């Protein structure tokens, strides 16, 4: 029998004057420019952050490919992926152990905000009762390119994986010749 659960995640659009407040106990990851031109544009403020993130990804992937680390011989998948396609941007984020209720996706101005968290505590019986606790937390902010339909973002959580789809708009560039005096 198929599971027909509604796995879609609510997406909220928040404008500048309507921002909430939150207390966070861990440093926030800086925005990552997912524009295909961000890494090529030497004046892009996100260029250095993208280089840092790429370097971190390479280091992480290199440590995962040492002999004996990957016992099964299969590929190790990155915990997230972004595909910039012709008509949409598709994203995948691994969020193991989280349910739909644990995840919040919103758009704040030109930023896609993905938050999630889950706490669990388990008591073990006996005279010396110990409990085990687990906590997982996600807080990611991505700068969206100008050609996105920010009010049509869709998110779905399936088997611990968050899928986000952002439709693109057709941006027509207007060129105005300026006469030099």
From Swiss-Prot:
Similarity section: Belongs to the small heat shock protein (HSP20) family.
GO terms classed as biological process: response to heat
Record-given protein name: Small heat shock protein, chloroplastic
Keywords in alphabetical order: Chloroplast, Plastid, Stress response
Pfam families per UniProt: HSP20
Domain sHSP: 71-181
Protein's UniProt keywords contain Chloroplast: yes
Gene3D superfamilies: 2.60.40.790
Gene designation per UniProt: HSP22
Keyword Chloroplast among UniProt keywords: yes
CDD domains assigned: ACD_sHsps-like
Cellular component, GO annotation: chloroplast
Main location as per UniProt: plastid
